[in-house]
UniProtKB/Swiss-Prot annotation:
It holds the Pfam family Rhodanese. The active site is at C227, C392. This is Adenylyltransferase and sulfurtransferase MOCS3. Residues 335-436 form the Rhodanese domain. ATP binds at G80, D101, T108, N109, L110, H111, R112, K125, D169, N170. The keyword Acetylation does not apply. Its cofactor is Zn(2+). Keywords: ATP-binding, Cytoplasm, Metal-binding, Molybdenum cofactor biosynthesis, Multifunctional enzyme, Nucleotide-binding, Nucleotidyltransferase, Transferase, tRNA processing, Zinc.
Length: 438
């Protein structure tokens, strides 16, 4: 069709222009490096005008602005925290900002990751973030690392920067960043945000503790919730990300009041902050003590029993006999076999979309024994042959529910419930592509 041809031509033109723009940006970057080497001891007129509102602060001044200009910061994660933190670092005039992320921009990112736009969906996050930051401030250098941080590349990448900002959303990477920063003697500005709450601290700064001082061992995988599962309000990541930039700037300037040895908690429900004193540096910490046993990076996915990515985790708690695929469940529905489908998502998620005839019993009610076998089976309990299947959004909470319910069903001599592998996301991918995904 004529419209399809026109769209294809425009998309091709955009790809060509992006390639040309990338080449020009690289040329500009090379030219800037050449001149910046000769003027690193002073501010030019453009910089004085641009940063004047912060230069006049007694805490910054000309010498402070020069410190910012000479500084280099690596932001690990170009998502909800990394976007606001890198934005304010660029605005403040940090001379070299590195952006590390392995992912591409998705529509679900845009409510909180404000460096990305509808036009950059499908691009790598690092390229999208770099383009935005350089549009904001052409006088700084922005380097990109489109890769997943691993034990093999972490030291090589981190050693190029003065300070590291942890803007990730998974436990394994937190341990990896901590250990790498300890080995390289670099401060780590760590933030997290979930639902309507956030927290912030600085590790490995001067005599303060590192992450392992406070958390020597990782939590069980099934107890960890990321924003993909638990949700997050974009304004919360904005608050914490901006504060990460503030702490980074204070470290660069050498100012007092850095959140080392303290934890800042933000409650978005009440719009309140709490400042807690943390335990000091652990004398026998495996990473940062005087005689550390950890002298090189390890396999952090193995150590934490979870993937070192911000992508949705996939638990594996049940035996194959306790699970069925979405295709198998579709066959059960088509054959009109009598069964009960339990959806363990929260009521607000259940309202978004649900499979026909499913019963909503939230996972929290199941785990806290507020609702059990009778709530699930109802009048069907007298039928020993009724099959019970459990579904959730991605197939994690449903496994927890089955593991909790199995002994209760066994006590009553009833067949064990079975988990639907991959949850509603798998249903959309493999059975009904029109079923909403979120």
């Amino acid at each position: 069709m004529e419209g399809d041809t026109e769209i294809a031509e425009l998309e091709s033109d955009i790809r060509t222009l992006r390639k040309q723009l990338k080449e020009k940006v690289q040329q500009l970057k090379t030219l800037k490096k050449h001149f910046q080497k000769n003027c690193i001891t002073k501010l030019n007129n453009n910089e004085i005008a641009r940063y004047s509102r912060q230069i006049i602060l007694s805490e910054i001044g000309v010498q402070g602005q020069l410190k910012l200009k000479r500084a280099s910061v690596l932001v690990v994660g170009a998502g909800g925290l990394g976007c606001p933190s890198s934005l304010y670092l660029a605005g403040a005039g940090v001379g070299h900002i590195g952006i590390l992320d392995y992912d591409e921009v998705e529509l679900t990112n845009l409510h909180r990751q404000l460096l990305h736009t509808e036009s950059t969906v499908g691009l790598t996050k690092v390229d999208s973030a770099r383009d935005y930051l350089q549009e904001l401030n052409s006088q700084i250098e922005v380097s990109t690392h489109h890769t997943q941080l691993t034990s093999d590349n972490a030291l090589t990448i981190l050693e190029q920067y003065d300070i590291v900002v942890d803007a990730t959303d998974n436990v394994a990477t937190r341990y990896l960043l901590n250990d790498a920063c300890v080995l390289l003697k670099k401060p780590l500005v760590s933030g997290s945000a979930l639902q309507l709450e956030g927290q912030l601290t600085v590790y490995n700064h001067k005599s303060g503790p590192c992450y392992r001082c406070l958390f020597p061992n990782p939590p069980p995988p099934e107890t960890v919730t990321n924003c993909g599962d638990g949700g997050v309000l974009g304004a919360i990541t904005g608050v914490i990300g901006a504060l990460q930039a503030l702490e980074t700037i204070k470290i660069i300037l050498g100012n007092d009041g850095v959140l080392s040895g303290r934890l800042l908690l933000f409650d978005g429900h009440q719009s309140s902050f709490r400042n807690l004193k943390l335990r000091g540096k652990k004398a026998d910490c495996v990473a940062c003590s005087d005689n550390p046993s950890l002298t090189k990076l390890i396999d952090y996915e193995q150590f934490c029993s979870m993937k070192a990515t911000d992508k949705d985790s996939h638990l594996d708690l049940l035996s194959p006999e306790e699970r069925i695929t979405v295709q198998e469940y579709k066959s059960i529905v088509d054959s009109k076999q009598r069964h009960v489908l339990v959806d363990v998502r929260g009521a607000n998620q259940f309202e978004i979309c649900q499979l026909p005839c499913s019963v909503n019993v939230p996972i929290e009610d199941i785990l806290k024994n507020r609702r059990g076998v009778t709530d699930i089976l109802g009048s069907s309990e007298s039928d020993d042959e009724v099959a019970v299947f459990v579904v959730c959004r991605r197939g994690n909470d449903s496994q927890l529910a089955v593991r909790h319910l199995a002994p209760l069903f066994k006590e009553r001599g009833l067949p064990t419930p079975r988990d639907i592998v991959g949850g509603l996301h798998a249903w959309t991918r493999n059975v009904d592509k029109e079923f909403p995904i979120y």
